[in-house]
Amino acid sequence: MTSASPSPLRAANAASSAPVPPPAMKPSAPPVNILPTQLARTYSFVHPAALLAILATRFQALVADPVAEMLNTLPFLALLQVTYVMVCLPPAGSVLPSPPASPVSDGDEKEKEKEKEKEKEKEKRKLPLRAGKLPRKKNQTHAAGLSAKLTPALLSLILTFLLATPVLSLLLVLFGAPLTTHNAETVLCAAHMALLASTALIYVHGVDGAVWREVWAFARPADAVWGGALGTALGAWFGAVPIPLDWDRPWQAFPITILTGAYFGFAVGSVVCRSSWLFGKWLEFTPEQDDRDKKTE
């Protein structure tokens, strides 16, 4: 008695019912590195430390008069954030994903070597410049590089005040800030949080809709920019915890602890998320594959 061979239809159904692993997550834009200069690397650590130092020195004034203190320190925070993005981060459009490597033939390699040799010979033939004279091309290149950074920095600052501040003000109200009172405190706190969280995001990613969908979905890979924004939000969230407690301390008034938490969150997030054990990773909210397999069995 011969056994019947399995039909190809059954084999196809069995193959289609097998669990398929989820596709690997790919961000629309790669994680952002700090610029590879000694100044950028040094200032990327000095900047969060300077923000915390300013907060510590002005904390008593913040407790005494939150509105006046937040209003007075807002221009300095804007200047520090613009300096930070210009010194440490690449502007939007300057970092592009690397194209796939194409096979290079021996002839192409020889041509490239010849071109490099020709360039070296041209550099050797150049006459030395006279002392006291600067090359015009170098000055023009420096001015163009400064303009390429200053323009997106100012645009990011404008968009931060026009768009991010109203959105964060609304979110503060939705999460419990007073609606009919303390309006100045709410708007100024939102402005400080917007400068901390949004300035670098807008400077680096511009108005790319795919990137901003990932930002609102908490699906960005970890880097200094995303870490600073996420740290600002989490710090403000945890900073609101002491407000309803009955400790009767003057620093518990709204929005002192929220603003303090936002500053600490930005400093910690921007430093920690650029470390080697977190850089490039992202939060995953999907269930584990093993749990899905158990439910289907």
UniProtKB/Swiss-Prot annotation:
Q: List the disulfide bonds.
A: none
Listed GO CC annotations: endoplasmic reticulum membrane
Region annotation Disordered: where it falls in the sequence: 1-26, 97-140
- Chain intervals with Basic residues compositional bias: 127-140
Q: Which InterPro entries match?
A: GPI_biosynthesis_protein_Pig-F (IPR009580)
Q: In which pathway does it act?
A: Glycolipid biosynthesis; glycosylphosphatidylinositol-anchor biosynthesis
The main location class comes to endoplasmic reticulum
- State the Gene Ontology BP annotations: GPI anchor biosynthetic process
Residues carrying covalently attached carbohydrate according to the record: N139
- Transmembrane ranges, per UniProt, are 44-64, 76-96, 157-177, 187-207, 225-245, 253-273
Keyword check for Ligase: no
Q: Name one GO molecular function term.
A: mannose-ethanolamine phosphotransferase activity
This chain's function reads:
Acts in the GPI biosynthetic pathway between GlcNAc-PI synthesis and GPI transfer to protein.
Q: What is this protein called?
A: Glycosylphosphatidylinositol anchor biosynthesis protein 11
